[in-house]
UniProtKB/Swiss-Prot annotation:
This is dCTP deaminase. The lineage of its organism: Bacteria, Pseudomonadati, Pseudomonadota, Alphaproteobacteria, Rickettsiales. HAMAP family: dCTP_deaminase. Homotrimer. Keywords: Hydrolase, Nucleotide metabolism, Nucleotide-binding.
Length: 188
């Protein structure tokens, strides 16, 4: 597997509609204000988080159970900036919609701006022929409230191209998160 360059990413966007909307260069300023960057980078794509968040709460004193997940664990917010409580967790989603080629696996890493503030983003791999908005998992590892800015860069996706096409893609095995739109909760 090889990591793919900005040139390959641009070609995949133009020929396979891999990312939409797509920013062909790094965007660092919006309306004359500095923002957390997003867009095409040398060997990846920095995606934005939308204004749709689900923040974990203990108001209802429920248990977080991945096999029987309750929406009572969360508070929904549509905001320009999401405040994550100390040592807590929130879900968001990318603005960008991804369509992954059959011979590509995508991994996500955090942005240093957030990581240096104790905010960690986690995403499981985007598998061959998966498509949808990516649900982003944000952890606030600090003892203080932490802020995530909507419509700004949140994470970077790295595209790994295989030298061999997989026998069965995510679409063919009818993965449960196929074509997800919005913040998607755990499914079993």
């Amino acid at each position: 597997m090889a990591i793919m360059s900005d040139k390959w990413i641009k070609d995949a966007v133009m020929n396979q509609n891999m990312i939409r909307p797509f920013a062909a260069k790094q965007v660092r300023v919006h309306n004359k204000e500095k923002i957390i960057s997003y867009g095409l980078s040398s060997y990846g794509y920095d995606a934005r988080v939308s204004n749709e968040f689900k923040i974990f709460t203990n108001i209802n004193s429920t248990t977080v159970d991945p096999k029987n997940f309750s929406e009572y664990n969360l508070v929904d917010r549509e905001v320009d900036a999401c405040i994550i409580p100390p040592n807590s967790f929130a879900l968001g989603r990318t603005i960008e919609y991804f369509k992954i080629p059959r011979d590509v696996l995508v991994i996500c890493v955090g942005k240093s701006t957030y990581a240096r503030c104790g905010i960690i983003v986690n995403v499981t791999p985007l598998e061959p022929e998966w498509e949808g908005h990516v649900t982003l998992e944000f952890s606030n590892t600090t003892p203080l409230p932490a802020k995530i800015y909507a419509n700004e860069g949140a994470c970077q996706f790295l595209f790994l191209k295989s030298d061999q096409i997989c026998d069965t893609s995510y679409a063919e095995r009818q993965g449960k998160y196929m074509k997800q739109v919005g913040v998607t909760l755990p499914l079993t």
